[in-house]
């Protein structure tokens, strides 16, 4: 999903985990991917900066990036995705945690 947000505002980890990727990815701009174990991963795209590095352990609510427009969209926003066993799933239940 794409969530409109103020440019430069914090992007926070949805759950505890380990950073798998903090780099540019075509179509997503600057991306942070967090592995939460049990096959669950979260992807945060369109960032202006990453605040974590590959291998870092993160806690739920920890700032991991800052909102930007690196995905090529005109408005600052966050691309947010959850993958379970490699398949995209509805991220909305995760947002209520």
Regions found by a protein language model. Give the residues of each.
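Catalytic cores of peptidoglycan-degrading enzymes
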Residues: 1-97
